[in-house]
């Protein structure tokens, strides 16, 4: 097993995502940010994230952390899934709930997949978190993606305190797995 890196280059141009990941990983590992425009393949979230990690590691020539997020609607056989970004750009959070207007089932699953890649030529390691909820009309601040229309136990992500959200969110769950993995590398 390779040693734990001194820092990780988190590849994202999303300042809200960066702040959330920094908050969750605070005190665990130094997180640096790189905003690289990566080609994003179409496929499963695992395939997309793995490919992004390989491309980013090649570009950075060192250890990277990348992330891909899905929002899956049971009534639509898990669509939009990894393509949620494009739905959000077209509809926005205020209109997202209309996608399920013709369905009784409003259940949704938020899925976050991180990939760590040690560097060029190394196989990425995946860490995935999932949170079950439902799609609702937008409530709360709309500054962070679909947080205002994804409800977990009566509150949208946007209505939650950030530290509370980070404990139960798909991203928080995935990063807990990453933290456990990093701790095992230190202990090895």
From Swiss-Prot:
Its main location: cytoplasm. Binds 1 divalent metal cation per subunit; can use either Mg(2+) or Mn(2+). Keywords: Cytoplasm, Hydrolase, Magnesium, Manganese, Metal-binding, Nucleotide metabolism, Nucleotide-binding, Nucleus. GO terms for molecular function: dITP diphosphatase activity; ITP diphosphatase activity; metal ion binding; nucleoside triphosphate diphosphatase activity; nucleotide binding; XTP diphosphatase activity. It comes from the Eukaryota. GO terms for cellular component: cytoplasm; nucleus. Its EC number is 3.6.1.66. The keyword Lipid metabolism does not apply. It is found in: Cytoplasm; Nucleus. It catalyses: ITP + H2O = IMP + diphosphate + H(+); dITP + H2O = dIMP + diphosphate + H(+); XTP + H2O = XMP + diphosphate + H(+). The keyword Nucleotide-binding applies. One of its GO terms (biological process) is deoxyribonucleoside triphosphate catabolic process. Its cofactor is Mg(2+); Mn(2+). Coiled coil: none annotated. CDD domains: HAM1. Mg(2+) binds at residue 40. ITP binds at residues 12-17, 52, 68-69, 85, 144-147, 165, 170-171. It is an enzyme of class 3 (hydrolase). Homodimer. Pyrophosphatase that hydrolyzes non-canonical purine nucleotides such as inosine triphosphate (ITP), deoxyinosine triphosphate (dITP) or xanthosine 5'-triphosphate (XTP) to their respective monophosphate derivatives. The enzyme does not distinguish between the deoxy- and ribose forms. Probably excludes non-canonical purines from RNA and DNA precursor pools, thus preventing their incorporation into RNA and DNA and avoiding chromosomal lesions. NCBIfam families: RdgB/HAM1 family non-canonical purine NTP pyrophosphatase. HAMAP family: HAM1_NTPase. This is Inosine triphosphate pyrophosphatase. It comes from Phaeosphaeria nodorum (strain SN15 / ATCC MYA-4574 / FGSC 10173). The lineage of its organism: Eukaryota, Fungi, Dikarya, Ascomycota, Pezizomycotina.
């Amino acid at each position: 097993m390779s040693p734990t890196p001194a820092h990780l280059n988190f590849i994202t141009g999303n300042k809200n995502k960066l702040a959330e990941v920094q908050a969750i990983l605070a005190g665990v590992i130094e997180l640096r940010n790189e905003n690289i425009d990566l080609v994003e393949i179409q496929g499963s979230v695992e395939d997309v994230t793995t490919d992004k990690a390989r491309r980013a590691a090649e570009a950075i020539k060192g250890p990277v952390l990348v992330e891909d997020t899905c929002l899956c609607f049971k009534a639509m056989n898990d669509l939009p899934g990894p393509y949620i970004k494009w739905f959000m750009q077209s509809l926005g959070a205020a209109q997202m709930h209309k996608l399920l207007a013709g369905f009784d089932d409003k259940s949704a699953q938020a899925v976050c997949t991180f990939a760590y890649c040690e560097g060029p030529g190394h196989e990425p390691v995946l860490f995935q978190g999932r949170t079950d909820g439902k799609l609702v009309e937008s409530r709360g601040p709309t500054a962070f993606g679909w947080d205002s229309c994804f409800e977990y136990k009566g509150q949208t992500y946007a209505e939650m305190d950030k530290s509370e959200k980070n404990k139960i969110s798909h991203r928080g769950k995935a990063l807990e797995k990453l933290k456990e993995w990093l701790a095992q590398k230190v202990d090895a």
